[in-house]
Amino acid sequence: NKRIVSFFFLLLFAGSLYAAIGIIDLRTEQLKNPAGIDVRQPRLSWRIESDEQNVIQTAYHILVASSPELLEQGKGDIWDSGKIESDASQWITYQGKTLKCNAPYYWKAKIDTNKGATNWSALAFWTTGLFNEADWQGQWIGLDRAAPGDSETQWSRLAARYLRKEFAVKKSVKRATVHIAGMGLYELFINGQRIGNQVLAPAPTDYRKTILYNTYDVTSLLQTENAIGVTLGNGRFYTMRQNYKPYKIPTFGYPKLRLNLIVEYADGSKETIATNTSWKLTTEGPIRSNNEYDGEEYDARKELGAWTQTGYDDKDWMQAQRVSIPSGTLRAQMMPGMKVTETLKPVSIKKLGNKYILDIGQNMAGWVRFRIK
């Protein structure tokens, strides 16, 4: 009896030890479930979680599948690493089948340690972006000149560009993905809903070398009739004090847009809604000027109404133009975007003539939100 009790105690002890070790925080290129990466052999990482001390990994096993269902069945149809004797848990290079552009991949891992093996981790995933120039159907569009009301003197002014396109979806949608490069900054809307939670996108670069694009899954937003809307700001692409003396600040051209919306249907067919000269454009919106140095001028009398939704009357808008191609290489943004992290109230508000000065109490970058009665 004592032997039986001891045997069961050992089993329970081994079971508790087994459950006490796991792997968490699965990352691809050090990003958590990234969308639209343009790396053909991404690097995978995880962290060991354990109640025990001195746990050392001795081997790993990675599965990558084309669907969550296959991964749940333990089938790595894209890559099955097998058991690899290694203590590496960071920057493990993918060694499976050639990855396709604009495709989702699902993965999980398990490890052996000096104190037991783990169960399979929770599912993680990444999606690929567009690897080559040939993968982009979208043209660079915009308005490659100043509009009425713009000024390109020492104190430059350039109104935001507003672009829109309506399209229909007639079949059942399996997946819909947007790849967008909006220089210098953009906000993207589909059927009236703003896409993504990052701001001041994309991240700034040396535009002579690199232009970044972002990727979003918009499957749940598509209807039978749809509208895409994009606001283009200047960012650091069209530099607002480019003729500010005694220093010359580089500028890289007028705001411009390139976009692919790839719709994959349940019957296996695909369709791409891409930027071209069929898109409509106006500069007669409420954002009359915008730049990092001098802020934003917003004229609410020029608000455009429901321009990001279907059925909008854009007959007075111009056709978008094909514009000059940026010199930088188009690449996926492989870092987290900037986000709103805090909302602050002013510590004081002072009136100076017909202006109001808000003291936020600290140095910051952001926007003002207010109501007018």
Predicted regions: what they are:
Residues 55-104, 114-120, 136-144:
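Recognizes extended acidic, P/S/T-rich segments that occur
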Residues 126-136, 307-335:
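Predominantly extracellular/luminal regions of secreted and cell-surface proteins
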Residues 38-43, 173-175, 353, 363-367:
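Short coil/turn motif common to extracellular beta-sandwich-like domains
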Residues 6-16:
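Bacterial N-terminal signal peptides
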